[in-house]
A protein has these predicted regions:
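Phosphate- and other anionic-substrate recognition elements at nucleic-acid/protein interfaces
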Residues: 1-150
Length: 150
């Protein structure tokens, strides 16, 4: 059984999506307000065994935003490796995960949400929809790697 976790990163919340054996399992959003304890608690809601975690590598234009995202990313990565020390962690820029998920690189929020629903996910908000597409992108890149290995 292959379990993939997709994570959409925002300074005050994280979107999560769990994919099991190539099929949507669950997606949700957790408000963290940047606190490391809330990040660890949010990860505790995830399955105990995960093969790959894919998270968004946010692109920002302003230094203040980069610092906020960077702090959350560092805390998130620390919590991830604290729970799953041997997990395969990848980070995708927004354009990368959109293309790997089957969307144009410049797809807007509405199109991403609609695409997640078409793929079988039931997101309640945009962060969960983004996380779902990130999980699909991670599954696609794992499939590509398997094809190359053959």
């Amino acid at each position: 059984m292959t379990t993939i976790l997709g994570i959409d990163v925002q300074p005050t919340r994280l979107g999560f999506a769990v994919m099991v054996d190539g099929k949507p399992h669950d997606c949700w959003t957790t408000h963290i307000d940047g606190f490391p304890t809330k990040i660890a608690a949010a990860l505790a809601d995830c399955p105990p065994r995960i093969e790959r975690i894919a998270r968004e590598w946010p692109i920002t234009r302003f230094v203040s935003h980069a610092r906020r995202y960077g702090a959350v990313e560092a805390r998130l990565d620390d919590a991830i490796f604290g729970m799953w020390p041997d997990v395969d962690l990848v980070a995708y820029k927004p354009t990368e995960w959109k293309v790997r998920c089957g969307l144009p690189g410049n797809a807007d929020k509405a199109r991403i949400f609609a695409h997640a629903v078409v793929l079988g996910w039931k997101p309640l908000d945009q962060d969960a929809a983004d996380a779902a597409c990130i999980a699909v992108a991670a599954a696609a890149s794992m499939d590509e790697a398997r094809q190359v290995a053959r």
